[in-house]
């Protein structure tokens, strides 16, 4: 079950521009390769929906929104372009790939599944599913020089995706789909980057997310040592979704907040997101000691040193009320272990024969845009400011396949 070790970029720089230049220089070849795939993907998806895309114009439109919200992110992308020797609009397009694909009418079969367990030691993780043709277009990273140092995974040329920062603020990432999605606002990947580089607390992270003027939908799950919440973002607004009464957050690729679910696009097109959500909700009940309890769940604490730390209640909540703090654990039923790597892969390793394809495998043949795979499995432990990353789906993970990352000090 050995998986190849991923490149880890150590990004440094005392200004956004310098951090971008450092990223561009280090990832130059990978950015060039990734752009070629995305350029073809944009065109293929648009053609399949009888649409024509002006990708430079769309990318620069998102830049204008970003400059108004967080100009330092634009400066960082400008640095990436310079370091990589690429036109600026191509780097902007990579960071706005979710928004541009929304304009193209992209189907999102596969996508991501996330689990978080709150309690005395809140932990979580996810499958990151994307196009098989981009399986080599991502890397691990540590970033210093911003307000908060952070670590995580991202795609070549994209500033951030999944990660945790030195303040112990982690973010997990699931794309959603809304009828109003477009490429006019701040790209969701840049919103995640802003949280990782600036948020010093759970409340700050949630405040940044709910204040971001996005134009494409996503749910970013904020995880700290003692609390968690999913923040649903859409052109129609935002909503904070609290854990259920057992302390669990189960996320796939549809809205849970009723006000935003009225504009649901993904679930109407592809009901498999509901199948994954239903299966995972059943599995976490088993993990917590329900019918068919998995007694081997204690092995995570022994194997990885993660201590012990529970379907869905949705709706707006204030940042400080989204989950109980360490001294207010009423209503949360602590189970046999934290959600470390071993427990995470047992819960996420599900295929079609199990009732839903949480762990995705690409078909051998097929066109670009239709070959989805789980490219990475990520476990996050905010109390330790750390992640563990497995290159591939949870069904291929083992103790020796995880790469540990710790958020650096700025």
Give the residues covered by each predicted segment:
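C-terminus-biased signal that marks the final domain/tail of proteins
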Residues: 1-110, 198-219, 224-230, 234-236, ...
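Acidic, Ser/Thr-rich peripheral helices and adjacent loops at domain boundaries
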Residues: 240-244
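Intrinsically disordered, low-complexity terminal tails and inter-domain linkers enriched
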Residues: 285-343
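Residue-level marker of intrinsically disordered, low-complexity segments enriched
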Residues: 9, 141, 151, 296-299, ...
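Short, surface-exposed beta-strand-loop junctions and turns on beta-sheet-rich folds
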Residues: 130-132, 177-179, 236-238, 394-397
